[in-house]
């Protein structure tokens, strides 16, 4: 059973998924079908841009009033939201479920260093 906060998160996230998809579609990014590999590569490219900003000191974005890493992390999430809506994936619910699952895991499970 979802609590009030989780239910609100799902509602808000799914609303933003629709908005992200519509903005992308309205700007011509859904005119041709992309394969799943392309979609993932575009998400990855945003993470690579975040890495480059951090390598250069994480200066301000050229577009919005945030750091470059903040902007690129936002771009990753926007791309995920766009894809999630297009593919009819329940990412908001999966986030909640995964966080609950992670809470139950042992400290540094699997003996991993990072």
Regions found by a protein language model. Give the residues of each.
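Flexible "arm" and connector segments at domain edges
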Residues: 1-114
